[in-house]
């Protein structure tokens, strides 16, 4: 007797989540303009027309990816600041952010999101998200505006350090070694 297999169908929401994860990786490598929706669909094992049933446009897909990315950063900061005194929150959030940057897709997607800001709709979403993040860090840390500004400045520098993979040349280049000492970059108050 032949054995039958039961194939479970993914819901549209499960499929959307799967596609977003694939698209984050694709956009991280090739950017908004350089990423093909055909390549995303192929990796997801679906047709391009089905992709466009789930996401009406490439921009809508990119923004869905950005929303997931944005929530990961917010959750990283919320978790890091939970249960610690406000004066320690920036240090904890900074360390958690450094760990988050170990994820190549997240690190590169963030840079690609900034690069995609030539599109006014994307720019508006990224700008609003950044403002929300600044407010969250200010609230969680209770830090003065100039300290929060320094925290975000250091975060942007960490993005560049990670994107350039300065750790790979730190043994040969003293300047790179110094810049790869991120704990010293996190504001203490």
Predicted region positions:
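Hydrophobic/aromatic-rich alpha-helical bundle segments in the mid-to-C-terminal region
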Residues: 120-189
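Solvent-exposed, amphipathic alpha-helical segments
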Residues: 22, 26-29, 76-79, 109-113
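Amphipathic alpha-helical segments used for helix-helix packing
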Residues: 98-120, 130
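Alpha-helical DNA-contacting segments of helix-turn-helix folds
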Residues: 62-69
């Amino acid at each position: 007797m032949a054995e039958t297999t039961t194939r479970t169908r993914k819901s549209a929401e499960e499929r959307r989540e799967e596609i977003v994860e694939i698209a984050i990786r694709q956009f991280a490598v090739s950017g908004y303009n350089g990423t093909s929706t055909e390549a995303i669909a192929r990796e997801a094992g679906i047709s391009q027309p089905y992709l466009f049933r789930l996401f009406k446009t490439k921009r809508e897909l990119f923004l869905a990816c950005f929303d997931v990315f944005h929530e990961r950063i917010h959750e990283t900061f919320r978790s890091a600041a939970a249960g610690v005194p406000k004066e320690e929150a920036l240090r904890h959030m900074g360390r958690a952010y450094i760990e988050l940057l170990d994820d190549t897709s997240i690190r590169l997607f963030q840079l690609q999101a900034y690069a995609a800001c030539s599109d006014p709709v994307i720019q508006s979403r990224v700008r609003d998200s950044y403002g929300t993040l600044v407010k969250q860090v200010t609230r969680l840390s209770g830090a003065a505006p100039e300290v929060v500004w320094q925290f975000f400045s250091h975060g942007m520098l960490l993005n560049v350090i990670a994107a350039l993979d300065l750790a790979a040349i730190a043994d040969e280049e003293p300047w790179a070694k110094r810049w790869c000492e991120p704990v010293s970059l996190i504001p203490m108050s």
